[in-house]
Amino acid sequence: RDTDRSRGLGDVYKRQNYHKRNKRYIHEAMRFDLLKEDPYKGERFSRGKHAIRKYLTAEELKKVKDAQIDSETICRVRDLFVFQAYTGIAYADLAKFDFKHELQKRGDKYVILDARVKTDENYFIVLLSPAMEILRKYDFVLPKITNQQYNLRLKIVADYAGFDRNLTVHMARHTFATMCLNNGVKMENVSKMLGHTNVRTTQQYAKAVSYTHLRAHETDQYL
Protein backbone atom coordinates (compact mmCIF):
# COMPACT_ATOMS: atom_id res chain seq x y z
CA ARG A 1 0.00 0.00 0.00
CA ASP A 2 1.07 3.61 -0.61
CA THR A 3 0.99 4.31 3.14
CA ASP A 4 3.30 1.38 3.87
CA ARG A 5 5.59 2.39 1.02
CA SER A 6 5.76 6.00 2.25
CA ARG A 7 6.48 4.80 5.78
CA GLY A 8 9.25 2.54 4.44
CA LEU A 9 10.79 5.40 2.49
CA GLY A 10 10.60 7.56 5.59
CA ASP A 11 12.58 4.95 7.53
CA VAL A 12 15.21 4.90 4.78
CA TYR A 13 15.63 8.68 4.93
CA LYS A 14 15.85 8.61 8.74
CA ARG A 15 18.67 6.06 8.54
CA GLN A 16 20.44 8.11 5.87
CA ASN A 17 20.26 11.26 8.00
CA TYR A 18 21.42 9.36 11.09
CA HIS A 19 24.53 8.07 9.32
CA LYS A 20 25.17 11.44 7.68
CA ARG A 21 25.19 13.17 11.08
CA ASN A 22 27.40 10.44 12.57
CA LYS A 23 29.94 10.81 9.77
CA ARG A 24 30.07 14.56 10.33
CA TYR A 25 30.81 14.07 14.05
CA ILE A 26 33.41 11.39 13.29
CA HIS A 27 35.24 13.60 10.79
CA GLU A 28 35.25 16.43 13.31
CA ALA A 29 36.68 14.10 15.98
CA MET A 30 39.39 12.93 13.58
CA ARG A 31 40.29 16.54 12.81
CA PHE A 32 41.08 17.08 16.49
CA ASP A 33 42.88 13.71 16.78
CA LEU A 34 40.17 12.32 19.07
CA LEU A 35 39.68 9.39 16.70
CA LYS A 36 42.37 7.62 14.69
CA GLU A 37 40.33 6.20 11.82
CA ASP A 38 36.90 6.45 10.24
CA PRO A 39 34.71 3.46 11.23
CA TYR A 40 32.62 4.15 8.13
CA LYS A 41 35.58 3.64 5.80
CA GLY A 42 34.67 1.15 3.08
CA GLU A 43 30.99 1.03 4.10
CA ARG A 44 28.29 1.62 1.49
CA PHE A 45 24.71 2.57 2.31
CA SER A 46 21.70 2.38 0.03
CA ARG A 47 20.37 5.82 -0.90
CA GLY A 48 16.85 4.47 -1.35
CA LYS A 49 14.35 5.65 -3.96
CA HIS A 50 12.90 9.12 -4.44
CA ALA A 51 9.97 9.77 -2.14
CA ILE A 52 6.60 9.55 -3.84
CA ARG A 53 5.29 13.03 -4.58
CA LYS A 54 2.03 13.74 -2.78
CA TYR A 55 -0.70 15.33 -4.86
CA LEU A 56 -4.48 15.64 -5.04
CA THR A 57 -6.66 13.82 -7.53
CA ALA A 58 -9.25 15.75 -9.54
CA GLU A 59 -11.97 14.62 -7.13
CA GLU A 60 -9.96 15.69 -4.10
CA LEU A 61 -9.18 19.12 -5.54
CA LYS A 62 -12.89 19.58 -6.28
CA LYS A 63 -13.67 18.75 -2.64
CA VAL A 64 -11.25 21.46 -1.54
CA LYS A 65 -12.75 23.98 -3.99
CA ASP A 66 -16.34 23.17 -3.02
CA ALA A 67 -15.85 22.83 0.75
CA GLN A 68 -18.30 24.96 2.72
CA ILE A 69 -16.02 27.01 4.97
CA ASP A 70 -17.53 29.38 7.53
CA SER A 71 -14.28 31.15 8.42
CA GLU A 72 -13.00 33.96 6.17
CA THR A 73 -9.42 33.29 7.25
CA ILE A 74 -9.59 29.58 6.35
CA CYS A 75 -11.44 30.41 3.14
CA ARG A 76 -8.56 32.66 2.08
CA VAL A 77 -6.09 29.85 2.81
CA ARG A 78 -8.18 27.45 0.71
CA ASP A 79 -8.20 29.95 -2.17
CA LEU A 80 -4.42 30.30 -2.05
CA PHE A 81 -4.02 26.51 -2.16
CA VAL A 82 -6.41 26.16 -5.12
CA PHE A 83 -4.61 29.01 -6.91
CA GLN A 84 -1.30 27.18 -6.46
CA ALA A 85 -2.84 23.91 -7.62
CA TYR A 86 -3.85 25.57 -10.91
CA THR A 87 -0.59 27.45 -11.44
CA GLY A 88 2.18 25.38 -9.83
CA ILE A 89 3.67 28.57 -8.43
CA ALA A 90 5.91 28.02 -5.40
CA TYR A 91 4.98 29.66 -2.09
CA ALA A 92 7.96 32.05 -2.06
CA ASP A 93 7.25 33.14 -5.65
CA LEU A 94 3.56 33.58 -4.89
CA ALA A 95 4.38 35.83 -1.94
CA LYS A 96 6.78 37.94 -4.01
CA PHE A 97 4.87 38.38 -7.28
CA ASP A 98 2.82 41.56 -7.85
CA PHE A 99 -0.21 40.23 -9.72
CA LYS A 100 -1.77 43.68 -10.03
CA HIS A 101 1.14 45.19 -11.96
CA GLU A 102 3.37 42.40 -13.29
CA LEU A 103 0.94 40.09 -15.10
CA GLN A 104 1.41 40.01 -18.87
CA LYS A 105 -1.15 39.24 -21.55
CA ARG A 106 -0.59 36.90 -24.47
CA GLY A 107 -3.57 36.54 -26.74
CA ASP A 108 -6.58 36.06 -24.49
CA LYS A 109 -4.56 34.64 -21.58
CA TYR A 110 -2.72 36.23 -18.68
CA VAL A 111 0.75 34.89 -17.97
CA ILE A 112 3.37 35.10 -15.23
CA LEU A 113 6.98 35.61 -16.33
CA ASP A 114 9.42 35.78 -13.45
CA ALA A 115 12.49 34.22 -11.81
CA ARG A 116 12.19 31.84 -8.88
CA VAL A 117 13.23 33.08 -5.46
CA LYS A 118 14.85 29.75 -4.61
CA THR A 119 17.00 29.21 -7.72
CA ASP A 120 16.74 32.42 -9.80
CA GLU A 121 15.58 30.14 -12.64
CA ASN A 122 13.06 31.73 -15.01
CA TYR A 123 9.55 30.29 -15.02
CA PHE A 124 6.47 30.86 -17.17
CA ILE A 125 2.87 30.17 -16.13
CA VAL A 126 -0.32 30.52 -18.15
CA LEU A 127 -3.19 31.43 -15.83
CA LEU A 128 -6.14 29.10 -16.36
CA SER A 129 -9.75 30.04 -15.62
CA PRO A 130 -9.90 28.76 -12.00
CA ALA A 131 -6.76 30.75 -11.13
CA MET A 132 -8.13 33.88 -12.81
CA GLU A 133 -11.39 33.55 -10.87
CA ILE A 134 -9.45 33.63 -7.60
CA LEU A 135 -7.32 36.60 -8.71
CA ARG A 136 -10.43 38.57 -9.66
CA LYS A 137 -12.08 37.66 -6.36
CA TYR A 138 -9.23 39.44 -4.55
CA ASP A 139 -8.85 42.23 -7.13
CA PHE A 140 -5.44 40.82 -8.12
CA VAL A 141 -4.02 41.23 -4.60
CA LEU A 142 -3.83 37.76 -3.04
CA PRO A 143 -3.87 37.34 0.75
CA LYS A 144 -0.50 37.27 2.53
CA ILE A 145 0.35 34.59 5.07
CA THR A 146 3.54 33.09 6.50
CA ASN A 147 4.56 29.65 5.31
CA GLN A 148 4.15 28.25 8.83
CA GLN A 149 0.64 29.65 9.29
CA TYR A 150 -0.28 28.55 5.78
CA ASN A 151 0.60 24.91 6.50
CA LEU A 152 -1.10 25.00 9.91
CA ARG A 153 -4.34 26.34 8.47
CA LEU A 154 -4.25 23.92 5.56
CA LYS A 155 -4.86 21.20 8.15
CA ILE A 156 -8.18 22.90 8.91
CA VAL A 157 -8.96 23.14 5.19
CA ALA A 158 -8.35 19.38 4.97
CA ASP A 159 -10.89 18.85 7.77
CA TYR A 160 -13.50 20.94 5.93
CA ALA A 161 -12.85 18.93 2.76
CA GLY A 162 -13.35 15.68 4.70
CA PHE A 163 -9.79 14.37 4.26
CA ASP A 164 -8.09 12.01 6.68
CA ARG A 165 -4.68 13.37 5.68
CA ASN A 166 -3.12 16.81 5.83
CA LEU A 167 -2.72 19.28 3.01
CA THR A 168 0.62 21.05 2.59
CA VAL A 169 1.85 23.99 0.55
CA HIS A 170 4.03 21.70 -1.61
CA MET A 171 1.08 19.41 -2.35
CA ALA A 172 -0.54 22.15 -4.45
CA ARG A 173 2.53 22.49 -6.65
CA HIS A 174 2.80 18.71 -7.03
CA THR A 175 -0.89 18.57 -7.97
CA PHE A 176 -0.33 21.06 -10.77
CA ALA A 177 2.67 19.14 -12.11
CA THR A 178 0.87 15.79 -12.20
CA MET A 179 -2.25 17.29 -13.75
CA CYS A 180 -0.20 18.82 -16.57
CA LEU A 181 1.80 15.69 -17.31
CA ASN A 182 -1.26 13.48 -17.29
CA ASN A 183 -3.03 15.73 -19.75
CA GLY A 184 -0.27 15.66 -22.31
CA VAL A 185 1.62 18.86 -21.55
CA LYS A 186 5.20 18.27 -22.68
CA MET A 187 7.70 17.48 -19.93
CA GLU A 188 10.00 20.34 -20.95
CA ASN A 189 7.09 22.81 -20.82
CA VAL A 190 6.05 21.63 -17.35
CA SER A 191 9.68 22.06 -16.33
CA LYS A 192 9.61 25.67 -17.59
CA MET A 193 6.39 26.42 -15.74
CA LEU A 194 7.76 25.02 -12.49
CA GLY A 195 11.10 26.75 -12.94
CA HIS A 196 13.07 23.54 -12.52
CA THR A 197 16.78 23.75 -13.26
CA ASN A 198 16.80 20.14 -14.48
CA VAL A 199 14.06 18.25 -16.32
CA ARG A 200 14.89 15.15 -14.22
CA THR A 201 13.29 16.93 -11.27
CA THR A 202 10.08 17.26 -13.29
CA GLN A 203 10.15 13.56 -14.18
CA GLN A 204 9.54 12.70 -10.53
CA TYR A 205 5.96 13.93 -10.99
CA ALA A 206 5.19 11.62 -13.90
CA LYS A 207 3.45 8.88 -11.87
CA ALA A 208 -0.07 10.15 -11.30
CA VAL A 209 -3.71 9.56 -12.06
CA SER A 210 -5.56 11.10 -15.01
CA TYR A 211 -6.72 14.69 -14.62
CA THR A 212 -9.69 16.22 -16.43
CA HIS A 213 -9.49 19.90 -15.45
CA LEU A 214 -6.77 20.99 -17.89
CA ARG A 215 -6.44 20.79 -21.66
CA ALA A 216 -2.83 20.47 -22.76
CA HIS A 217 -3.12 22.97 -25.61
CA GLU A 218 -4.13 25.72 -23.16
CA THR A 219 -0.53 25.93 -22.00
CA ASP A 220 1.53 24.36 -24.80
CA GLN A 221 0.49 26.98 -27.37
CA TYR A 222 2.04 29.74 -25.27
CA LEU A 223 5.41 28.06 -24.67
What are these regions (language model features)?
Residues 17, 76-77, 164-184:
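Short basic/aromatic active-site micro-motif
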Residues 18, 35-91, 95:
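Basic, Lys/Arg- and aromatic-enriched nucleic-acid-binding interface segment
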Residues 82, 86, 93, 173-197, ...:
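C-terminal catalytic core of tyrosine-transesterase DNA break-rejoin enzymes
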Residues 116-156:
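C-terminal catalytic core of Y-nucleophile DNA break-rejoin enzymes
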